Amino acid sequence: MSRRFALTYENKILRKIIITVSIVILVFIATGCDSVQNEVKDVTDIPLNSKLDSLISESIIAWNQDKLNHTEKQFETHVIYGTEMKDEKMYVYLHSLMQGYNRETQTVPQAGHLLPVRVTVTKNGDDYIIEDYHEPGDGAENEPTLRNMSPNKYADQALAISNKIIQSLESRMQESVSKWLEETNNERQER
């Protein structure tokens, strides 16, 4: 009888262990799914008016014009990690995809970058002024300079940029390029 009790007791312990492990695994799976969703939400749901968003794109292209002067048309799209206000200045932390194109090469970019950027913005009445554009150093200097120019929460996001976000940026870029090519083709046909 004591042997039967021992087996039953061992079975109960084994059953409790299996249930506990299953619950822990489910919690990890659920938490993992939530963190991915939160990462995307944090990246895409930061409010920024379209006027400022357009100005940021135009300014990034202007700051990098010397790198793209051999291309006919330049485009920039970005994902914003967040903003901070300090001393009447807004610091915008983002990941920028900028590329230059020629009609001859169609949708094949001729130059560009994909990198984290900090843009410093001030407001003058209803207008925004881009005061500064800062990107991290290359190679071994990349992470230290990124962490120096950005809060850790934004630097961490930039260093762990997902393929989903990169694909989203590339998709938006291709939409803009295709629209430009279509417009330039229509202009040529009207002549």
Task: Report each predicted region and the residues it spans.
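N-terminal export/targeting and maturation segments
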Residues: 35-96
